Amino acid sequence: MDAGVWYRSLPRFTRYWLTATVVLSMLCRFDVIPLHWLHLDRSAVFSKLQLWRCMTSLFVFPISSNTAFHFLINCFFIVQYSSKLEKDQYSRSPADYLYLLIVSAVLANIGGMIFNVYFLMDTLVLAITYIWCQLNKDVTVSFWFGTRFKAMYLPWVLAAFEFIFHFSLASLVGIFVGHVYYFFKFQYSQDLGGTPLLETPQFLKRLVPDVSGGFGGFGLPPESRAPPRQATESPWGRGMTLGRN
């Protein structure tokens, strides 16, 4: 497939996310923008009101010869799991997916400030991966060396590899972020009968109207969204510890 055709075929917010990540990271890689201006820094945010760091830390990644593969794998996960969420569960409700990203970004910033995670790409990527895996628990995924297991275990496997080999909490923070969203959006209301707590604000619905027609999975209980599918590849590899400059 032609690269331009493939790029335009990506769902809207996945495409925006991938573009912002690649462009901002490459600008820092070639020293067009100093990296230390963009990473999450609690004291700079609160003492100097450098509020842009809360946004840029979600997209910028410190690319080097040691971390390039890590960066590419994260981009793959954006394309793989963000696309699936946006096209399947949120196909008719793009504003709901935008709100998911906003809530996840806010929680990622809070977790990053608490645990001193300076670059939040891993955190946000794993949060979205976790949500997809919870909504598709029985899908079989393939990991390294041909190992296969249900999707619900994938985030924990990734976080374990990250922590064991790089002593990073970024992925665990991502799981926490994803679980908070999943619990309050789906489990609390559908399984426990609680009042929905993460309803998309109306101004976002007006900004990004729902799509009429078609068949979207959003709004169905997680266990009834889709039957088990064939294995999907997940060639995850880690090359750095988030929080390091």
From Swiss-Prot:
<keyword id="KW-0346">Stress response</keyword>
<dbReference type="GO" id="GO:0043065">
    <property type="term" value="P:positive regulation of apoptotic process"/>
</dbReference>
<keyword id="KW-0256">Endoplasmic reticulum</keyword>
<dbReference type="Pfam" id="PF04511">
    <property type="entry name" value="DER1"/>
</dbReference>
<dbReference type="InterPro" id="IPR035952">
    <property type="entry name" value="Rhomboid-like_sf"/>
</dbReference>
<dbReference type="InterPro" id="IPR007599">
    <property type="entry name" value="DER1"/>
</dbReference>
<dbReference type="GO" id="GO:0005789">
    <property type="term" value="C:endoplasmic reticulum membrane"/>
</dbReference>
<feature type="transmembrane region" description="Helical; Name=3">
    <location>
        <begin position="100"/>
        <end position="120"/>
    </location>
</feature>
<feature type="topological domain" description="Lumenal">
    <location>
        <begin position="121"/>
        <end position="156"/>
    </location>
</feature>
<feature type="transmembrane region" description="Helical; Name=2">
    <location>
        <begin position="59"/>
        <end position="79"/>
    </location>
</feature>
<keyword id="KW-1133">Transmembrane helix</keyword>
<keyword id="KW-0472">Membrane</keyword>
<dbReference type="GO" id="GO:0030968">
    <property type="term" value="P:endoplasmic reticulum unfolded protein response"/>
</dbReference>
<dbReference type="GO" id="GO:0036503">
    <property type="term" value="P:ERAD pathway"/>
</dbReference>
<keyword id="KW-0812">Transmembrane</keyword>
<feature type="topological domain" description="Cytoplasmic">
    <location>
        <begin position="80"/>
        <end position="99"/>
    </location>
</feature>
<protein>
    <recommendedName>
        <fullName>Derlin-1</fullName>
    </recommendedName>
</protein>
<comment type="function">
    <text>May be involved in the degradation process of specific misfolded endoplasmic reticulum (ER) luminal proteins. May also involved in endoplasmic reticulum stress-induced pre-emptive quality control, a mechanism that selectively attenuates the translocation of newly synthesized proteins into the endoplasmic reticulum and reroutes them to the cytosol for proteasomal degradation.</text>
</comment>
<dbReference type="GO" id="GO:0006515">
    <property type="term" value="P:protein quality control for misfolded or incompletely synthesized proteins"/>
</dbReference>
<feature type="topological domain" description="Lumenal">
    <location>
        <begin position="39"/>
        <end position="58"/>
    </location>
</feature>
<feature type="topological domain" description="Cytoplasmic">
    <location>
        <begin position="1"/>
        <end position="17"/>
    </location>
</feature>
<dbReference type="GO" id="GO:0034976">
    <property type="term" value="P:response to endoplasmic reticulum stress"/>
</dbReference>
<feature type="region of interest" description="Disordered">
    <location>
        <begin position="218"/>
        <end position="245"/>
    </location>
</feature>
<comment type="similarity">
    <text>Belongs to the derlin family.</text>
</comment>
<feature type="transmembrane region" description="Helical; Name=1">
    <location>
        <begin position="18"/>
        <end position="38"/>
    </location>
</feature>
<dbReference type="GO" id="GO:0005047">
    <property type="term" value="F:signal recognition particle binding"/>
</dbReference>
<feature type="transmembrane region" description="Helical; Name=4">
    <location>
        <begin position="157"/>
        <end position="177"/>
    </location>
</feature>
<feature type="topological domain" description="Cytoplasmic">
    <location>
        <begin position="178"/>
        <end position="245"/>
    </location>
</feature>
